[in-house]
Amino acid sequence: MKMVKSKNMLMYLVKRVLIMVVMIFFVLVATFFLTNLMEVNPVLNKMSSDPRVPWEIYLEERERIGVDKPIFERFLIYMTNFFQGNWGRSYIVADGVPVTTLIAQIFPPTIELVLIPIILIPILSVKLGIASAKHRNKWQDSIIRGVIMLGVCVPIFFLATLIQFFASNILNVYTYGVIDFETSSANSINIDYINRLTGFRLIDAFLFNDQALLQDSLLHILLPSIASIVVSLASITRQTRASMLDVMRMDYVRTARAKGVAEKDVINKHALRNALIPTSNEIIGLVASLLIGSLFTEMIFNYKGMGWYLFAAIQGGDYVVIMGLIIVDSIIILSGTLVADVLYTVIDPRIVY
């Protein structure tokens, strides 16, 4: 039986990976045409700082980067280069740097930014959802639902702006500088990031015992993480609460209570396991929401990760950077959904693919 189940799972994974490849291809095609139909002229944006540039130079530059060609010809050239590992070179946001090199440089800061929310949000949201369901219609439930409403109603860019203003203009002033959070960028100007072994500041700080870099990096990550946690906490907490309320009405939960099982064991061993099945999909979807939310948090806190560069590339018309970043985000999101489906079988062995 186990061999049959393992074989079915393997076949399912192979099928899902093939579907992912097809979906990524369609994302690539759609992204190319949508970005190239944008009314943004990258050459004009780059040369607008110097109005004395002759028109002939402008035309030569358009020809050099290939934007003068018909869109379908550009598409064939890009696809050929893409599958050969050449994703193009940035023209605006990192002049001349290969897109793959740029992504390798800005991927670690974004992962560090979303790492704390990814770890804390599932733990906090499940705990809050259980507490809210357990104390339904009591003051504990009212407080938790109030926090949920805050996360649902307040956009992340607005909340991030409020947090930044509070930390820089109120908290710092009224504590006379004793409490001083860094409210922009990934590191302070006076902190040297020399030992770039992994590209992850926190990991490199641990490896090289750089206490100054570690403390500074954590201070810069803290405020954007708080904004992400408050906003993303809401959906998973709400889903956990609803699932727990449904499960706690089931006969097997009532039977466990009738047998004298402790309430703690009823919640953790009987109810929670089944309530986590729909919630696990929300938790995996958290990765997608955090990546999308990083576009706003990185812009507000001037944190130069994937979101910051994506926004800058859209503004400047740096097409190859836009496409490269969206493809990477798509791969992460699709991989996350695959992991969620596999986790279903771990949470509930009755699910067979």
Region locations from a protein language model:
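N-terminal Sec/SRP start-transfer signal
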Residues: M1-L18, A258
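An internal, D/E-rich "acidic patch" concept
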Residues: K2-M9, V67-V126
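Transmembrane-helix boundary motif in ABC transporter permease subunits
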Residues: N8, Y12, F32, N36, ...
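Alpha-helical transmembrane segments of integral membrane proteins
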Residues: L10, F107-P108, E112, I116-Q140, ...
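Transmembrane helix irregularities
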Residues: M38, G151-V154, L291
